[in-house]
A protein has these predicted regions:
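Acidic, metal-coordinating helix/loop segments flanking the phosphotransfer/catalytic sites
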Residues: 3-23, 31
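Two-component signal transduction core modules
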Residues: 24, 50, 73-75
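Conserved polar catalytic motif of the HATPase_c/GHKL fold
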Residues: 152-156
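C-terminal output helix
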Residues: 60, 77-89
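Alpha4 helix (beta4-alpha4-beta5 surface) of REC/receiver domains from two-component response regulators
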Residues: 32-36, 40, 45, 55-75
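Bergerat-fold GHKL ATPase/HATPase_c domain
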Residues: 87-148, 159, 163, 268-276
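Conserved beta-strand-loop-beta-strand hairpin that lines the nucleotide-binding pocket
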Residues: 105-110, 158-276
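His-Asp phosphorelay/catalytic-motif detector in bacterial-type signaling
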Residues: 20-22, 44-51
């Protein structure tokens, strides 16, 4: 582990290292400007994962996250959540470990998994999930928020995840009845002492990291407020307390949502894990 107290020290440490780093964590308060170091670091180590650590809002900086391929922002809490810190950095280094709702829950937990291949499956699963969530959320407004986010993820997987050989989307909203043989959407829902959670995974892996980053940037910065594409991910991020995007190209795409039992999360983290 190499540490630095300012940009000058950080640059010197990076330049004097003869082996690639596994990952780099940069405090947003690194003086005088953390992105001065990141820009220099990216020239020497273009593929090393970089994460930011911050206690303040960072969404205005999203274009810089996109520019420098920063796919994780860890929110500093008091006390610091070392489990969250360790898991996030491990996910960046070993992205195959990032998949699955259980990765983000702690024992003791409850976890349910269901496969969706038809509209009937989707409707039955959603009713089962809502009954589960109602055990922990007595207010209809909370349930409506979770349901909206969960359904948005499932719809995104069905209507945007499956494509024809031409690249065109295979299933149309309002016309979907059943996936073709070999296609499936896997959903999970569960809880631990801190969160309710859900995940949606398609077995196509058509989600593209650069497209995801650009769409989120346009929505977060309000440049794409009228865009028809990209609203789904932005909506689910807004409705949840934590969102994790996991991509294994041509294999599977997954989004995990977490909803805190205590709504004290003021700054939302950012997690995007990509298997190269």
């Amino acid at each position: 582990v190499v540490t630095a107290e300012n940009v000058t020290q950080a640059i010197a440490s990076a330049e004097n290292t003869f082996e690639d780093f596994d990952a780099v964590l940069v405090d947003l308060n690194l003086p005088p400007n953390p992105f001065e170091f990141i820009a220099r670091f990216r020239k020497e180590f273009p593929h090393v994962p970089v994460a930011l650590l911050t206690a303040t809002d960072y969404e205005s900086l999203f274009p810089l996250l996109n520019k420098y391929d920063i796919f994780a922002v860890i929110v500093r809490t008091a006390p610091l959540d070392f489990d969250e810190l360790g898991r996030t950095m491990e996910n960046l280094i070993y992205p195959s470990k990032a998949f699955g709702l259980a990765r983000y829950l702690r024992e003791p937990m409850e976890l349910v998994q269901r496969n969706i291949t038809s509209l009937e499956d989707k409707q039955a699963m959603m009713e089962e999930a809502i009954k589960f969530f109602r055990r922990f959320r007595p207010h209809d407004t909370d349930i409506s928020q979770i349901r909206l986010a969960f359904e948005e993820l499932i719809n995104n997987a069905i209507y945007h995840g499956f494509r024809r050989s031409t690249g065109a989307e295979k299933y149309a909203l309002g016309a979907f009845e059943r996936l073709e043989r070999g296609e499936q959407v896997v959903v999970e829902f569960g809880r631990d002492k801190n969160f309710l959670g859900c995940s949606v995974t398609d077995n196509q892996g058509t989600m593209d990291i650069s497209t995801v980053m650009k769409k989120l940037e346009r929505q977060i910065t309000r440049e794409g407020i009228l865009d028809e594409s990209g609203r789904g991910l932005y909506l689910t991020r807004t409705l949840s307390d934590k969102m994790v995007i996991n991509i294994h190209p041509a294999v599977m795409s997954q989004v995990v949502l977490l909803f805190a039992h205590r709504h004290n999360i003021k700054v939302k983290p950012f997690h995007l894990n990509y298997m190269r």
